[in-house]
């Protein structure tokens, strides 16, 4: 009896495109249509109730044992230790019982004299490798296959990471979780190798060492990616590229303070673009470094001490070498109080550097966007490089023509006045208009005051003439004719020299018609009285 020849089974699909081809599908997932929709709806409702927060919480509360005894004993021990600490602290600060004030000052002076007499400055012999300068030119890199190369000037990567994490102002619980992952061995190695790779790439190119470092960077990143729990991956790796970029930038500022002029905005932009592309495959937004809280690194170290300006340091050290009288001057004194030795120009520069500038957008419609096909096989070049380096198959980097798209900035808006500039100009114009309004208002008040004074003078003159009219009619008539003659002469002069009248003459011209109109009535009354 002949056995049937076994048929060769087809190979399983190794990529997303092969899977669609084997199923004769154009896209996936397919739309599922259920026959008994009511039964499926009941099943889905029961499933939602079973996996709800309340049901899971009640199940855990019922079945998971709770060890309250351990917590109670720990709390009691903490309270006991706290009481003991308070008791000992109170005894320590009872200075009247423990220290004699009269003897303390005499002993202090005696100890100071003893220390001053027998003081010898300590001399520490540094190896050639430990003696590093504070600039880019004096630093060299030596690759070690078995361990990471230490940072310049014996900087501690953990201290740098902690400094960067504290600038983010995380909550206490979030800070503790991120601190555990960021200070892990693979993350520390990632900072070391990324710093040295960027140092070689930017300042002292060496293709061989850069390739070795990049291999180790990929290893460290994949190890870190695997160690992060699944529920925290998205949140952590959304924050980590920016954190690593800030840590590398901080390391450059701490390692080479004399070369801080090289670490400008373009340096930060290139560094951030490189690290973001390594870890996520995407570039960050333009000007991402503006939200960093590292502006004081040029003048302050990560430990809070003030930096001595480079110009001041270069001027102090040669003077100590050539002038014998300044050899006793300690550089520590300058470090403690650099303002006492700095010039006013440096003080102005330090004050100007502290002035915070608020970012503002251009007055425009904003950047132009366009849709870009998302590459599912190249989200992280480091992970992809790691898989290729270890010759792991099943990696497809081809684009799916019907895949997911995401929005990308096509063109940034052209430079234009910002909204802050517009608001500042509007405030300035408003202030100028307010000043002009006050000036015009004051001038109108002065004109009204002048007109009232002229009106009062004319009224007084008329009252005086009317008072004299009852006493001596002939004298009043002569004075009145003189007054009219004077008014006619002034009016004639104004007509001849019109256009050159002063501000004081304008109110008189305004009042002259009124006065001339009233004078004929007075003359008529005077003639009637004379005839009578």
Curated annotation (Swiss-Prot):
Region (Disordered): 494-532
InterPro entries assigned: FAM227
Positions in coiled-coil regions: 432-482
Compositionally biased residues, Low complexity: 500-523
One Pfam family recorded for the sequence: FWWh
UniProt keyword terms in alphabetical order: Coiled coil
UniProt record similarity statement: Belongs to the FAM227 family.
Name by which UniProt lists this protein: Protein FAM227B
Organism annotation: Mus musculus (Mouse)
Gene behind this protein: Fam227b
